[in-house]
Amino acid sequence: MGREDRSGKRKSREQSRKRRVPELGYYYIVTDTDQTEKNYLEGLRNSIPEELKGKLVIKVSKSRTVDLVKTCKEGSSLYPQYCEPWVVFDRDQVKDFDGIIKNAEQNGIHAGWSNPCLEIWLYAYFGNMPYIQDSVSCCNRFATEYEKRTGQKYDKAEKDLYKKLCEVGNEESAIRIAQQKRKQCIENGLLIPSEMIPSTMIDELINEIRMKM
């Protein structure tokens, strides 16, 4: 049943839904981890100024890697007219990395991928995206840099990861670096995501949300 407005008249569910549409965007983001990506994205969500909460909404969900697109498609279908669907994941050891990205794009879902891992994007907050081929080496090198910059050990379960990166790093510079690295890959003929090292697309998600805050 609908709710009553101030005049006592009943409102339909459709009318109620229209009133709740976030005018600056509703971002439905599905990731395949319980730690780094999820904590980072929830930190981004928590950074939304109080006066914009309700107008700019970020919902982060978890799914198995193979079900990322399916889960995102199902969740975003609840708000098809204004939802911005994203899947966020690493190349890491994902077998069908390029296939997942292609599947997402074919379903109108943005793919915020990172190659070799999310830490290559986090590294950019410190002014650099070094050439590192595997995720283990990338995580270890980022952990060393993170400790040097913050004085704290890097922990994938760190809830304040986004906040700390913004405090000791430079997000605007990180976005520029990511754009430059992606451009370099393309200029070098590396057009397939699994071949684009180092590279990421998550900067596009961050930049889009930043512009609305």
Region spans (language model):
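Catalytic nucleophile-elbow at a beta strand-turn-alpha helix junction centered on a G-D-S/GDSL motif
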Residues: 26-38
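Short amphipathic beta-strand starts and helix->beta connectors
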Residues: 11-15, 69-72
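Short glycine-centered, acidic/aromatic-flanked micro-motifs in structured strand/loop junctions
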Residues: 31, 89-91
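Short N-terminal edge-element motif at the start of the domain
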Residues: 65-80
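C-terminal accessory helical subdomains adjacent to catalytic cores in phosphodiester-
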Residues: 2-6, 12-24, 38, 42-59, ...
